[in-house]
Amino acid sequence: VYDKGNGSGDRDRIGEVLYNRGMVAAMWTTEAIRNAMKIHGTKEVRGEHVRDGFEALNVDENRLRELGLPNFTYPVKITCENHEGPAKVAIQQWDAKKKEWKMITGFYDSMRDIVDPLIEEDSMAYAKENGITPRKGCEL
């Protein structure tokens, strides 16, 4: 992108945490829209179509390679029941001499047995406080 003159912002930001997060978010969103077009048989997707695309998102190692992002992030599979995917975390450390972030751990699994009930409880409370009827079922 930058080599073709299409980059935005400072090229030195490439590889920084926020840059990488933006790249991953853009890739997931693009793949979800691609799924939405396939699922609904249209290039003119609406919000609910994109939701369905996200809920059928499966970016495995092969797809990461095809996208030119091998080892950039971990594979992700999103479903209606699980909007987070694997919910992994890693730790990075700033190297002041090289002026770059370095991954200092691999990816760890989150403590779903602890976190999921808290998310469910808070989500139900939010829905009740705001008069929202929680969605039931995951049919397209």
Predicted feature descriptions by range:
Residues 23-27:
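Extracytoplasmic/secretory soluble proteins
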Residues 2-19, 30-104, 110:
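Segments of small-molecule ligand-sensing domains
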